[in-house]
């Protein structure tokens, strides 16, 4: 409280209004033992130039010399400078949905374009105006499935992102719904026999990754067929959305719901977030979809306009009728993804996806020449798991060379046969052939 713009007279007037004798009165609810009895131990004041130099020096200690090979749900991709420049426009630079939305036609049109891109890439009929992130989108999909089917069991593949599954468990902890996790096989894909045994007449949804957390392209059509036979919904979860520029759309393979994140478009890694979640469905479920939808309409003068519709969140309708309590969504992050996709276009996205696929193959071949084999035989997109002997040691060793090597899988899958050596690494358009070769030789030691 030692530095603020108010004069002593201002402070005295405010204290008189609230009936306090001093500023200390405002903190009486905090026990004395928890209060700091001395000023903070801060360095001397510095001018702006000196301060920024110090901050840059501190930031440089965390910098790596090369693009990271770490993916595991958050991916290093090039963000065109035009994305950040357009985000800075005053009309857009807020994460908030306007409380008088029809006044903000530009924002609404951007959200409408987001929904269009989501539907095009997922093969679904309807998308909402974004979710918090991929994990909460998946959890909301499970809740929607229980409402649609009237059932209470969620069957999820162990190859789905482990942290997504933790969020799912948190959401369902108080609902009484059951979560059954089915294993993946030696090829990295969901074990279809185990899936078929787990799915029954009480199953509301089957959730599989597309691609999975392990980087492989999972058996989505077969999983969807098993779910459909039991009357359950199929939820496809995508964390690496660039894959949708190459793979068949989830909707074309039998998925009823497609969720995930578009972090790979227009959004830097930023220590894991923020990242826009997407949620797309078949039209028959539109009344049960969480969040809100931006729709196009025509006003009384025949002019095209945009409105928020089907806003079944508890801020807009009675709580007991709401499909979710989602508040401020990831609107600005969704706009970044929308701008990036618009800049890429259909052909550009396909080229980007093919390049990522090719770089993953290059990574596999380079590590193969170094005598390091992939853990799983199923085809990957741009991320692979390898047995490097001691993953934690490799990560620590390469970090000293300015290379972020990947994510040790033992953190999430200690039961893996070769868990100690399991390292999950990604290769994207940022990883040049020379860098991939350097990485392979560095891992080899």
UniProtKB/Swiss-Prot annotation:
Highest rank taxon of the organism: Bacteria
- Pfam families of this UniProt entry? GDC-P (PF02347)
Q: What class of enzyme is it?
A: oxidoreductase
List UniProt keywords, sorted A-Z.
Oxidoreductase
What CDD domains does its record include? GDC-P
Q: What does this protein do?
A: The glycine cleavage system catalyzes the degradation of glycine. The P protein binds the alpha-amino group of glycine through its pyridoxal phosphate cofactor; CO(2) is released and the remaining methylamine moiety is then transferred to the lipoamide cofactor of the H protein.
Family statement drawn from the similarity comment of this UniProt entry: Belongs to the GcvP family. N-terminal subunit subfamily.
Q: What is this protein called?
A: Probable glycine dehydrogenase (decarboxylating) subunit 1
Question: What is the scientific name of the source organism?
Answer: Anaeromyxobacter sp. (strain Fw109-5)
Q: Which gene encodes it?
A: gcvPA
């Amino acid at each position: 409280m030692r530095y603020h713009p108010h004069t002593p007279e201002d402070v005295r007037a405010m204290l008189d209004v609230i009936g306090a004798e001093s500023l200390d009165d405002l903190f009486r609810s905090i026990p004395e033992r928890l209060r700091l009895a001395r000023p903070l131990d801060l360095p001397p004041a510095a001018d702006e130039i000196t301060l920024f130099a110090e901050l840059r020096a501190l930031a440089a200690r965390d910098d790596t010399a090369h693009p990271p090979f770490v993916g595991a749900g958050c991916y290093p991709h090039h963000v065109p400078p035009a994305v950040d420049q357009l985000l800075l426009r005053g009309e857009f630079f807020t994460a908030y949905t306007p409380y008088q939305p029809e006044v903000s036609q530009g924002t609404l049109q951007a959200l409408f374009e987001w929904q269009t891109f989501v539907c095009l890439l997922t093969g679904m009929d309807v998308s909402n105006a974004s979710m918090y992130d991929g994990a909460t989108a998946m959890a909301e999909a499970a809740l929607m499935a229980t409402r649609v089917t009237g059932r209470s069991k969620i069957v999820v593949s162990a190859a789905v992102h482990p942290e997504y599954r933790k969020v799912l468990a948190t959401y369902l902890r108080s609902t009484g719904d059951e979560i059954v996790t089915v294993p993946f096989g030696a090829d990295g894909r969901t074990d279809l026999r185990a899936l078929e045994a787990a799915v029954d007449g009480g199953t509301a949804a089957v959730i599989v990754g597309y691609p999975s957390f392990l980087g492989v392209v999972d058996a989505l059509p077969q999983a969807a067929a098993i779910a459909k036979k039991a009357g359950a919904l199929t939820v496809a979860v995508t964390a690496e959305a660039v894959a949708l520029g190459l793979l068949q759309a989830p909707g074309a393979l039998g998925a009823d719901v497609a969720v995930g994140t578009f972090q790979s478009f227009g959004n830097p890694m930023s220590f894991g977030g923020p990242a826009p979640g997407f949620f797309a469905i078949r039209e028959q479920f539109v009344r049960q979809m969480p969040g809100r939808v931006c729709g196009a309409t025509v006003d009384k003068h025949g002019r095209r306009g945009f409105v928020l519709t089907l806003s079944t969140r508890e801020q807009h309708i009675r709580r007991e009728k709401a499909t979710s309590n989602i508040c401020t969504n990831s609107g600005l992050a969704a706009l970044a993804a929308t701008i990036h996709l618009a800049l890429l276009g259909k052909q550009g996205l396909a080229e980007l996806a093919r390049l990522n696929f090719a770089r993953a193959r290059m990574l596999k071949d380079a590590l193969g020449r170094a005598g390091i084999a992939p853990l799983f035989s199923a085809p990957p997109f741009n991320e692979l798991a390898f047995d490097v002997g001691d993953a934690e040691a490799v990560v620590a060793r390469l970090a000293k060379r300015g290379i972020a090597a990947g994510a040790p899988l033992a953190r999430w899958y200690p039961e893996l046969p070769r868990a100690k050596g399991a390292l999950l690494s990604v290769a994207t358009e940022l990883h040049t052939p020379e860098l991939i070769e350097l990485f392979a030789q560095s891992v080899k030691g």
